[in-house]
Amino acid sequence: MFSLQDICRKHLFQLPDAFDEYILQALGLYWEKHGSLQRIRKDAVFVQRNLIISTNEALRIAASEGNERVINLLLSWEGNFHYVIIGALEGNRYDLIHKYGSQIKDYHMILSSIQNANTFEKCHELSNCDMWCLIDNAIKYNMLSILQKHRNFLTEELENQEFFETACEEQKYDIVLWIGQTLLLDEPKFIFDTAFKMVDFSLLTIGYSLLFDNKMDIQDDLTSLLTEHLEKAAAKGQLYFMLETLKHGGDVNFEVLSKAVENDHRKILDYFIRRQQCLSREDIENLLLSAITNCASKKTLNLLLSYLNYSIKNITEKIVQHVIKGGDYTIIILLKKKKINLVEPVLTGFIDQYYSYCFIENFIREFAIRPERLIKMAARKGKLNMIIEFLNEKYVHKDDLGTIFKLLKNLVCTMKHKKGKETLIILIHKIYQDIHLETKEKFKLLKFYVMHDATIQFLSMCKDCFNLAGFKPFVLECLDIAIKKNHPNMIQNIEILSKYE
Protein backbone atom coordinates (compact mmCIF):
# COMPACT_ATOMS: atom_id res chain seq x y z
CA MET A 1 0.00 0.00 0.00
CA PHE A 2 1.28 3.47 -0.89
CA SER A 3 1.97 5.93 1.91
CA LEU A 4 0.66 9.49 1.88
CA GLN A 5 4.23 10.69 1.36
CA ASP A 6 4.62 8.48 -1.72
CA ILE A 7 1.41 9.80 -3.22
CA CYS A 8 2.42 13.40 -2.53
CA ARG A 9 5.89 12.95 -3.94
CA LYS A 10 4.60 11.35 -7.14
CA HIS A 11 1.68 13.64 -7.92
CA LEU A 12 2.29 16.98 -6.22
CA PHE A 13 3.28 19.41 -9.02
CA GLN A 14 2.68 22.66 -7.10
CA LEU A 15 4.31 23.00 -3.69
CA PRO A 16 2.54 25.39 -1.30
CA ASP A 17 4.73 28.33 -0.22
CA ALA A 18 3.94 27.49 3.40
CA PHE A 19 5.94 24.24 3.17
CA ASP A 20 9.14 24.87 5.08
CA GLU A 21 12.31 22.80 5.01
CA TYR A 22 11.07 20.51 7.79
CA ILE A 23 7.85 19.61 5.93
CA LEU A 24 9.74 19.12 2.67
CA GLN A 25 12.17 16.77 4.37
CA ALA A 26 9.26 14.88 5.90
CA LEU A 27 7.68 14.51 2.48
CA GLY A 28 11.01 13.50 0.95
CA LEU A 29 10.99 16.54 -1.33
CA TYR A 30 14.18 18.06 -0.04
CA TRP A 31 17.54 17.55 -1.78
CA GLU A 32 20.49 18.00 0.51
CA LYS A 33 22.88 20.79 -0.63
CA HIS A 34 20.38 21.79 -3.34
CA GLY A 35 17.09 22.64 -1.67
CA SER A 36 13.46 21.84 -2.42
CA LEU A 37 12.69 19.43 -5.23
CA GLN A 38 9.48 19.75 -7.17
CA ARG A 39 8.17 17.98 -10.27
CA ILE A 40 6.88 20.57 -12.75
CA ARG A 41 6.55 18.51 -15.92
CA LYS A 42 6.69 14.89 -16.91
CA ASP A 43 10.37 15.28 -17.81
CA ALA A 44 11.58 18.19 -15.65
CA VAL A 45 12.06 19.24 -12.03
CA PHE A 46 12.24 22.56 -10.15
CA VAL A 47 15.16 22.87 -7.70
CA GLN A 48 14.93 25.41 -4.84
CA ARG A 49 12.06 27.06 -6.78
CA ASN A 50 14.48 28.80 -9.17
CA LEU A 51 16.29 26.20 -11.32
CA ILE A 52 14.63 24.00 -13.93
CA ILE A 53 16.55 20.92 -15.05
CA SER A 54 15.55 17.69 -16.73
CA THR A 55 14.58 14.76 -14.56
CA ASN A 56 17.41 12.70 -16.07
CA GLU A 57 20.00 15.41 -15.40
CA ALA A 58 18.87 15.60 -11.78
CA LEU A 59 19.09 11.81 -11.60
CA ARG A 60 22.68 11.88 -12.91
CA ILE A 61 23.72 14.48 -10.31
CA ALA A 62 22.00 12.62 -7.47
CA ALA A 63 23.70 9.36 -8.48
CA SER A 64 27.11 11.04 -8.64
CA GLU A 65 26.48 12.21 -5.04
CA GLY A 66 25.25 8.78 -3.97
CA ASN A 67 21.90 10.19 -2.77
CA GLU A 68 19.65 7.11 -2.99
CA ARG A 69 16.66 8.86 -1.46
CA VAL A 70 16.59 11.44 -4.28
CA ILE A 71 17.40 8.73 -6.84
CA ASN A 72 14.32 6.74 -5.80
CA LEU A 73 12.20 9.89 -5.90
CA LEU A 74 13.36 10.81 -9.40
CA LEU A 75 12.88 7.24 -10.65
CA SER A 76 9.28 7.43 -9.40
CA TRP A 77 9.01 10.59 -11.52
CA GLU A 78 9.79 8.48 -14.61
CA GLY A 79 13.52 9.20 -14.71
CA ASN A 80 15.65 6.88 -16.85
CA PHE A 81 17.75 4.54 -14.69
CA HIS A 82 20.52 4.72 -17.33
CA TYR A 83 21.38 8.09 -15.78
CA VAL A 84 21.85 6.41 -12.41
CA ILE A 85 24.67 4.38 -13.99
CA ILE A 86 26.14 7.47 -15.68
CA GLY A 87 26.11 9.49 -12.46
CA ALA A 88 27.47 6.57 -10.45
CA LEU A 89 30.39 6.25 -12.89
CA GLU A 90 31.12 9.97 -12.62
CA GLY A 91 31.14 9.79 -8.81
CA ASN A 92 32.77 6.35 -8.63
CA ARG A 93 29.69 5.03 -6.79
CA TYR A 94 30.17 1.38 -7.68
CA ASP A 95 27.68 0.30 -5.01
CA LEU A 96 24.96 1.96 -7.10
CA ILE A 97 26.28 0.32 -10.26
CA HIS A 98 26.11 -3.05 -8.50
CA LYS A 99 22.57 -2.30 -7.31
CA TYR A 100 21.12 -1.06 -10.63
CA GLY A 101 23.42 -2.89 -13.07
CA SER A 102 21.20 -5.97 -13.13
CA GLN A 103 18.58 -3.89 -14.96
CA ILE A 104 21.00 -3.13 -17.81
CA LYS A 105 20.95 -5.73 -20.59
CA ASP A 106 23.72 -4.07 -22.59
CA TYR A 107 25.89 -1.21 -21.40
CA HIS A 108 26.37 -0.12 -25.01
CA MET A 109 22.80 1.20 -24.86
CA ILE A 110 23.90 3.86 -22.35
CA LEU A 111 26.82 5.21 -24.40
CA SER A 112 24.69 7.54 -26.53
CA SER A 113 23.66 9.47 -23.38
CA ILE A 114 27.22 10.09 -22.13
CA GLN A 115 28.99 13.37 -22.92
CA ASN A 116 32.19 12.89 -20.92
CA ALA A 117 34.97 10.82 -22.52
CA ASN A 118 36.25 9.35 -19.24
CA THR A 119 32.76 8.30 -18.20
CA PHE A 120 32.21 6.91 -21.70
CA GLU A 121 35.29 4.72 -21.41
CA LYS A 122 34.38 3.57 -17.89
CA CYS A 123 30.91 2.58 -19.07
CA HIS A 124 32.35 0.65 -21.98
CA GLU A 125 34.63 -1.27 -19.61
CA LEU A 126 31.50 -2.61 -17.89
CA SER A 127 30.66 -4.38 -21.18
CA ASN A 128 33.91 -6.38 -21.05
CA CYS A 129 34.52 -5.69 -24.77
CA ASP A 130 37.87 -5.28 -26.53
CA MET A 131 39.63 -2.11 -27.62
CA TRP A 132 38.30 -2.39 -31.20
CA CYS A 133 34.76 -2.14 -29.86
CA LEU A 134 35.67 0.92 -27.79
CA ILE A 135 37.20 2.68 -30.81
CA ASP A 136 34.21 1.81 -32.97
CA ASN A 137 31.77 3.22 -30.41
CA ALA A 138 33.95 6.26 -29.82
CA ILE A 139 33.63 7.03 -33.52
CA LYS A 140 29.89 6.38 -33.50
CA TYR A 141 29.35 8.79 -30.60
CA ASN A 142 31.97 11.35 -31.67
CA MET A 143 34.47 10.82 -28.83
CA LEU A 144 37.59 12.03 -30.63
CA SER A 145 39.59 12.33 -27.41
CA ILE A 146 39.33 8.55 -26.91
CA LEU A 147 40.91 7.93 -30.33
CA GLN A 148 43.64 10.43 -29.54
CA LYS A 149 44.27 8.75 -26.17
CA HIS A 150 44.72 5.34 -27.82
CA ARG A 151 46.62 6.62 -30.87
CA ASN A 152 49.43 4.05 -30.39
CA PHE A 153 46.91 1.25 -30.72
CA LEU A 154 45.88 2.39 -34.23
CA THR A 155 48.75 1.02 -36.32
CA GLU A 156 47.13 -1.36 -38.84
CA GLU A 157 46.05 0.10 -42.20
CA LEU A 158 43.11 -2.28 -42.71
CA GLU A 159 41.65 -1.64 -39.25
CA ASN A 160 42.24 2.08 -39.62
CA GLN A 161 40.46 1.96 -42.98
CA GLU A 162 37.40 0.41 -41.33
CA PHE A 163 37.39 3.13 -38.68
CA PHE A 164 37.80 5.79 -41.37
CA GLU A 165 34.87 4.40 -43.34
CA THR A 166 32.72 4.25 -40.22
CA ALA A 167 33.54 7.88 -39.40
CA CYS A 168 32.66 8.94 -42.96
CA GLU A 169 29.37 7.04 -42.96
CA GLU A 170 28.47 8.33 -39.48
CA GLN A 171 29.41 11.86 -40.65
CA LYS A 172 31.72 12.49 -37.69
CA TYR A 173 33.73 15.22 -39.37
CA ASP A 174 36.29 15.95 -36.63
CA ILE A 175 37.17 12.27 -36.43
CA VAL A 176 37.33 11.93 -40.22
CA LEU A 177 39.77 14.83 -40.39
CA TRP A 178 41.90 13.50 -37.52
CA ILE A 179 42.12 9.97 -38.95
CA GLY A 180 42.95 11.34 -42.41
CA GLN A 181 45.69 13.56 -41.00
CA THR A 182 47.11 11.07 -38.48
CA LEU A 183 46.69 7.44 -39.51
CA LEU A 184 47.81 5.26 -42.40
CA LEU A 185 44.89 4.30 -44.66
CA ASP A 186 44.42 1.65 -47.34
CA GLU A 187 41.74 3.49 -49.42
CA PRO A 188 41.64 7.16 -48.38
CA LYS A 189 39.49 8.20 -51.36
CA PHE A 190 36.57 6.36 -49.73
CA ILE A 191 35.71 9.75 -48.26
CA PHE A 192 34.80 11.02 -51.74
CA ASP A 193 32.65 7.97 -52.53
CA THR A 194 30.72 8.54 -49.31
CA ALA A 195 30.42 12.28 -49.90
CA PHE A 196 28.77 11.72 -53.28
CA LYS A 197 26.65 8.82 -52.08
CA MET A 198 25.29 10.78 -49.10
CA VAL A 199 25.42 14.17 -50.88
CA ASP A 200 27.54 15.46 -47.99
CA PHE A 201 29.29 18.71 -48.89
CA SER A 202 31.25 18.80 -45.61
CA LEU A 203 32.81 15.40 -46.34
CA LEU A 204 33.78 16.59 -49.81
CA THR A 205 35.55 19.68 -48.49
CA ILE A 206 37.33 17.63 -45.80
CA GLY A 207 38.40 15.17 -48.49
CA TYR A 208 39.93 17.93 -50.60
CA SER A 209 41.58 19.41 -47.51
CA LEU A 210 43.21 16.04 -46.80
CA LEU A 211 44.12 15.57 -50.45
CA PHE A 212 45.70 18.95 -51.14
CA ASP A 213 46.66 20.39 -47.74
CA ASN A 214 47.80 17.19 -46.07
CA LYS A 215 49.01 15.48 -49.27
CA MET A 216 46.90 12.38 -48.69
CA ASP A 217 48.13 9.61 -51.01
CA ILE A 218 45.24 8.36 -53.16
CA GLN A 219 47.42 6.47 -55.67
CA ASP A 220 45.38 7.91 -58.56
CA ASP A 221 45.87 10.50 -61.26
CA LEU A 222 44.51 13.76 -59.82
CA THR A 223 43.11 15.03 -63.11
CA SER A 224 41.19 11.79 -63.66
CA LEU A 225 39.91 11.87 -60.09
CA LEU A 226 38.65 15.44 -60.36
CA THR A 227 36.99 14.71 -63.71
CA GLU A 228 35.28 11.70 -62.14
CA HIS A 229 34.06 13.93 -59.31
CA LEU A 230 32.70 16.50 -61.75
CA GLU A 231 30.81 13.80 -63.64
CA LYS A 232 29.33 12.37 -60.43
CA ALA A 233 28.29 15.81 -59.23
CA ALA A 234 26.73 16.64 -62.60
CA ALA A 235 24.82 13.34 -62.57
CA LYS A 236 23.42 14.13 -59.11
CA GLY A 237 22.66 17.76 -59.92
CA GLN A 238 25.05 19.05 -57.26
CA LEU A 239 26.27 22.38 -58.62
CA TYR A 240 28.03 23.32 -55.36
CA PHE A 241 29.97 20.04 -55.48
CA MET A 242 31.14 20.94 -58.97
CA LEU A 243 32.18 24.44 -57.96
CA GLU A 244 34.11 23.08 -54.97
CA THR A 245 35.87 20.53 -57.19
CA LEU A 246 36.78 23.19 -59.75
CA LYS A 247 38.62 25.14 -57.03
CA HIS A 248 41.18 22.34 -57.06
CA GLY A 249 41.31 21.65 -60.81
CA GLY A 250 39.39 19.76 -63.45
CA ASP A 251 37.49 20.94 -66.50
CA VAL A 252 33.78 21.07 -67.32
CA ASN A 253 33.55 19.51 -70.79
CA PHE A 254 31.03 17.66 -72.93
CA GLU A 255 31.46 14.38 -71.02
CA VAL A 256 30.75 16.11 -67.71
CA LEU A 257 27.68 18.01 -68.88
CA SER A 258 26.29 14.97 -70.68
CA LYS A 259 25.78 13.50 -67.19
CA ALA A 260 23.66 16.52 -66.30
CA VAL A 261 21.69 16.08 -69.52
CA GLU A 262 21.04 12.40 -68.81
CA ASN A 263 19.49 13.32 -65.46
CA ASP A 264 17.67 16.54 -66.44
CA HIS A 265 19.76 18.87 -64.28
CA ARG A 266 19.05 22.14 -66.07
CA LYS A 267 20.55 24.40 -63.40
CA ILE A 268 23.97 22.91 -64.09
CA LEU A 269 23.53 23.18 -67.86
CA ASP A 270 22.45 26.80 -67.62
CA TYR A 271 25.32 27.75 -65.31
CA PHE A 272 28.11 26.28 -67.41
CA ILE A 273 26.71 26.78 -70.92
CA ARG A 274 25.05 30.19 -70.67
CA ARG A 275 26.95 31.89 -67.84
CA GLN A 276 30.37 30.28 -68.15
CA GLN A 277 30.18 29.52 -71.89
CA CYS A 278 32.16 26.33 -71.42
CA LEU A 279 31.08 24.55 -74.62
CA SER A 280 31.35 25.10 -78.36
CA ARG A 281 28.26 25.05 -80.56
CA GLU A 282 29.21 21.57 -81.77
CA ASP A 283 29.33 20.31 -78.18
CA ILE A 284 25.89 21.80 -77.47
CA GLU A 285 24.54 20.07 -80.58
CA ASN A 286 25.96 16.79 -79.30
CA LEU A 287 24.39 17.43 -75.89
CA LEU A 288 21.04 17.86 -77.62
CA LEU A 289 21.49 14.51 -79.36
CA SER A 290 22.41 12.95 -76.03
CA ALA A 291 19.28 14.45 -74.48
CA ILE A 292 17.16 12.88 -77.23
CA THR A 293 18.78 9.48 -76.68
CA ASN A 294 18.17 9.69 -72.93
CA CYS A 295 14.53 10.79 -73.28
CA ALA A 296 15.17 14.12 -71.58
CA SER A 297 12.27 16.29 -70.46
CA LYS A 298 10.72 19.00 -72.63
CA LYS A 299 12.33 21.67 -70.45
CA THR A 300 15.81 20.25 -70.92
CA LEU A 301 15.34 19.89 -74.68
CA ASN A 302 13.96 23.41 -74.95
CA LEU A 303 16.88 24.77 -72.94
CA LEU A 304 19.43 23.15 -75.26
CA LEU A 305 17.50 24.27 -78.35
CA SER A 306 17.47 27.83 -77.01
CA TYR A 307 21.28 27.79 -76.78
CA LEU A 308 21.27 26.90 -80.48
CA ASN A 309 18.61 29.53 -81.26
CA TYR A 310 16.53 26.64 -82.63
CA SER A 311 18.89 26.45 -85.61
CA ILE A 312 19.45 22.74 -86.26
CA LYS A 313 20.38 22.61 -89.94
CA ASN A 314 23.71 20.91 -89.22
CA ILE A 315 22.17 18.10 -87.20
CA THR A 316 18.69 17.63 -88.70
CA GLU A 317 19.54 14.20 -90.07
CA LYS A 318 21.18 13.15 -86.79
CA ILE A 319 18.14 14.30 -84.82
CA VAL A 320 15.91 12.13 -87.00
CA GLN A 321 18.27 9.16 -86.56
CA HIS A 322 18.40 9.56 -82.77
CA VAL A 323 14.61 9.87 -82.51
CA ILE A 324 14.09 6.78 -84.66
CA LYS A 325 16.67 4.77 -82.72
CA GLY A 326 15.46 5.80 -79.26
CA GLY A 327 11.75 6.03 -79.97
CA ASP A 328 11.23 9.28 -78.03
CA TYR A 329 9.77 11.98 -80.28
CA THR A 330 9.40 14.83 -77.77
CA ILE A 331 11.94 16.89 -79.72
CA ILE A 332 9.80 16.57 -82.87
CA ILE A 333 6.84 18.08 -80.99
CA LEU A 334 8.97 21.01 -79.83
CA LEU A 335 10.46 21.63 -83.26
CA LYS A 336 7.05 21.51 -84.96
CA LYS A 337 5.89 24.34 -82.68
CA LYS A 338 8.82 26.34 -84.09
CA LYS A 339 7.72 25.55 -87.67
CA ILE A 340 10.45 22.93 -88.12
CA ASN A 341 8.61 19.85 -89.38
CA LEU A 342 10.44 16.52 -89.14
CA VAL A 343 7.31 14.39 -88.81
CA GLU A 344 7.55 12.74 -92.25
CA PRO A 345 11.15 11.41 -92.03
CA VAL A 346 10.62 10.28 -88.43
CA LEU A 347 7.40 8.42 -89.24
CA THR A 348 9.16 6.77 -92.17
CA GLY A 349 11.94 5.70 -89.83
CA PHE A 350 9.49 4.33 -87.25
CA ILE A 351 7.85 2.27 -89.98
CA ASP A 352 11.25 1.00 -91.16
CA GLN A 353 12.08 -0.05 -87.60
CA TYR A 354 8.63 -1.68 -87.35
CA TYR A 355 7.58 -0.08 -84.08
CA SER A 356 4.39 -1.55 -82.59
CA TYR A 357 1.03 -0.23 -83.71
CA CYS A 358 0.38 1.08 -80.19
CA PHE A 359 3.49 3.26 -80.48
CA ILE A 360 2.67 4.35 -84.03
CA GLU A 361 -0.92 5.12 -83.00
CA ASN A 362 0.28 7.57 -80.33
CA PHE A 363 2.55 9.21 -82.87
CA ILE A 364 -0.14 9.66 -85.54
CA ARG A 365 -2.58 10.94 -82.92
CA GLU A 366 -0.01 13.46 -81.67
CA PHE A 367 0.61 14.82 -85.15
CA ALA A 368 -2.92 14.27 -86.54
CA ILE A 369 -1.72 11.92 -89.30
CA ARG A 370 -4.51 10.30 -91.33
CA PRO A 371 -4.57 6.47 -91.16
CA GLU A 372 -4.60 6.29 -94.97
CA ARG A 373 -1.25 8.06 -95.04
CA LEU A 374 0.23 5.55 -92.62
CA ILE A 375 -1.07 2.60 -94.65
CA LYS A 376 0.41 4.00 -97.86
CA MET A 377 3.79 4.62 -96.23
CA ALA A 378 3.84 1.11 -94.76
CA ALA A 379 2.81 -0.33 -98.13
CA ARG A 380 5.66 1.44 -99.91
CA LYS A 381 8.02 -0.19 -97.39
CA GLY A 382 6.38 -3.60 -97.91
CA LYS A 383 5.31 -3.74 -94.23
CA LEU A 384 2.28 -5.99 -94.78
CA ASN A 385 2.18 -7.25 -91.18
CA MET A 386 2.20 -3.70 -89.86
CA ILE A 387 -0.79 -2.80 -92.03
CA ILE A 388 -2.65 -5.91 -90.87
CA GLU A 389 -1.91 -5.07 -87.22
CA PHE A 390 -3.07 -1.50 -87.77
CA LEU A 391 -6.32 -2.55 -89.46
CA ASN A 392 -7.03 -5.21 -86.82
CA GLU A 393 -6.70 -2.57 -84.11
CA LYS A 394 -8.81 0.01 -85.93
CA TYR A 395 -11.48 -2.36 -87.28
CA VAL A 396 -12.11 -4.94 -84.60
CA HIS A 397 -15.32 -6.57 -85.90
CA LYS A 398 -15.52 -9.15 -88.68
CA ASP A 399 -18.27 -7.05 -90.29
CA ASP A 400 -15.61 -4.38 -90.87
CA LEU A 401 -13.87 -6.50 -93.53
CA GLY A 402 -16.08 -5.02 -96.22
CA THR A 403 -15.14 -1.52 -95.11
CA ILE A 404 -11.43 -2.43 -95.10
CA PHE A 405 -11.84 -4.01 -98.55
CA LYS A 406 -13.22 -0.78 -100.03
CA LEU A 407 -10.63 1.36 -98.22
CA LEU A 408 -7.72 -0.65 -99.61
CA LYS A 409 -9.10 -0.60 -103.16
CA ASN A 410 -9.43 3.18 -103.01
CA LEU A 411 -5.86 3.49 -101.70
CA VAL A 412 -4.52 1.35 -104.56
CA CYS A 413 -6.31 3.57 -107.06
CA THR A 414 -4.65 6.69 -105.63
CA MET A 415 -1.14 5.21 -105.32
CA LYS A 416 1.64 5.53 -107.87
CA HIS A 417 4.26 3.51 -106.01
CA LYS A 418 4.41 0.07 -107.66
CA LYS A 419 5.66 -1.88 -104.64
CA GLY A 420 3.10 -0.15 -102.44
CA LYS A 421 0.29 -1.16 -104.79
CA GLU A 422 1.48 -4.76 -104.85
CA THR A 423 1.53 -4.91 -101.05
CA LEU A 424 -2.03 -3.61 -100.76
CA ILE A 425 -3.30 -5.91 -103.53
CA ILE A 426 -1.87 -8.92 -101.66
CA LEU A 427 -3.87 -7.84 -98.62
CA ILE A 428 -7.00 -7.20 -100.71
CA HIS A 429 -6.80 -10.74 -102.04
CA LYS A 430 -6.40 -12.16 -98.53
CA ILE A 431 -9.58 -10.36 -97.50
CA TYR A 432 -11.42 -11.53 -100.64
CA GLN A 433 -10.75 -15.11 -99.54
CA ASP A 434 -12.45 -14.41 -96.19
CA ILE A 435 -15.60 -12.61 -97.36
CA HIS A 436 -18.56 -13.45 -99.58
CA LEU A 437 -18.96 -11.50 -102.83
CA GLU A 438 -21.84 -11.61 -105.25
CA THR A 439 -21.06 -12.44 -108.91
CA LYS A 440 -21.24 -8.79 -109.90
CA GLU A 441 -18.77 -7.81 -107.15
CA LYS A 442 -16.42 -10.63 -108.13
CA PHE A 443 -16.33 -9.41 -111.73
CA LYS A 444 -15.62 -5.87 -110.47
CA LEU A 445 -12.69 -7.17 -108.44
CA LEU A 446 -11.34 -9.07 -111.46
CA LYS A 447 -11.44 -5.85 -113.50
CA PHE A 448 -9.65 -4.12 -110.63
CA TYR A 449 -6.86 -6.72 -110.78
CA VAL A 450 -6.55 -6.28 -114.54
CA MET A 451 -6.40 -2.49 -114.32
CA HIS A 452 -3.56 -2.71 -111.79
CA ASP A 453 -1.73 -5.58 -113.51
CA ALA A 454 -2.20 -7.98 -110.57
CA THR A 455 -1.75 -11.11 -112.69
CA ILE A 456 -1.25 -13.60 -109.85
CA GLN A 457 -4.38 -12.48 -108.00
CA PHE A 458 -6.37 -12.32 -111.26
CA LEU A 459 -5.54 -15.92 -112.22
CA SER A 460 -6.20 -17.16 -108.67
CA MET A 461 -9.64 -15.56 -108.66
CA CYS A 462 -10.47 -16.81 -112.16
CA LYS A 463 -10.35 -20.36 -110.79
CA ASP A 464 -13.18 -19.41 -108.44
CA CYS A 465 -15.20 -17.67 -111.17
CA PHE A 466 -14.62 -20.05 -114.10
CA ASN A 467 -18.07 -21.67 -113.89
CA LEU A 468 -20.01 -18.46 -113.28
CA ALA A 469 -22.55 -17.42 -115.94
CA GLY A 470 -21.15 -14.79 -118.27
CA PHE A 471 -17.56 -15.45 -117.29
CA LYS A 472 -16.23 -16.02 -120.85
CA PRO A 473 -17.58 -12.76 -122.34
CA PHE A 474 -16.35 -11.00 -119.21
CA VAL A 475 -12.84 -12.34 -119.85
CA LEU A 476 -12.90 -10.67 -123.27
CA GLU A 477 -13.82 -7.38 -121.57
CA CYS A 478 -10.81 -7.86 -119.31
CA LEU A 479 -8.64 -8.43 -122.38
CA ASP A 480 -9.72 -5.06 -123.81
CA ILE A 481 -8.80 -3.37 -120.51
CA ALA A 482 -5.38 -5.07 -120.41
CA ILE A 483 -4.69 -3.97 -124.00
CA LYS A 484 -5.69 -0.37 -123.22
CA LYS A 485 -3.52 -0.37 -120.09
CA ASN A 486 -0.66 -2.05 -121.97
CA HIS A 487 -0.09 -4.92 -119.52
CA PRO A 488 1.70 -7.53 -121.74
CA ASN A 489 1.87 -10.28 -119.12
CA MET A 490 -1.81 -9.84 -118.27
CA ILE A 491 -2.75 -9.87 -121.98
CA GLN A 492 -0.88 -13.13 -122.53
CA ASN A 493 -2.57 -14.87 -119.59
CA ILE A 494 -6.07 -13.65 -120.53
CA GLU A 495 -5.59 -14.86 -124.14
CA ILE A 496 -4.65 -18.30 -122.86
CA LEU A 497 -7.64 -18.27 -120.50
CA SER A 498 -10.08 -17.24 -123.28
CA LYS A 499 -9.23 -20.33 -125.34
CA TYR A 500 -10.84 -22.62 -122.75
CA GLU A 501 -14.51 -23.43 -123.26
Swiss-Prot record:
Q: Which domain of life is it from?
A: Viruses
Keywords from the named record: Early protein
Q: Which InterPro entries match?
A: MGF_505
Q: Which residues form a coiled coil?
A: none
> What conditions trigger expression of this protein?
Expressed in the early phase of the viral replicative cycle.
Fetch the Pfam families from UniProt.
DUF249
Signal peptide positions are: none
- What biological function has been recorded for the protein in this entry? Plays a role in virus cell tropism, and may be required for efficient virus replication in macrophages.
The protein's name in its UniProt record: Protein MGF 505-4R
The species is African swine fever virus (isolate Warthog/Namibia/Wart80/1980)
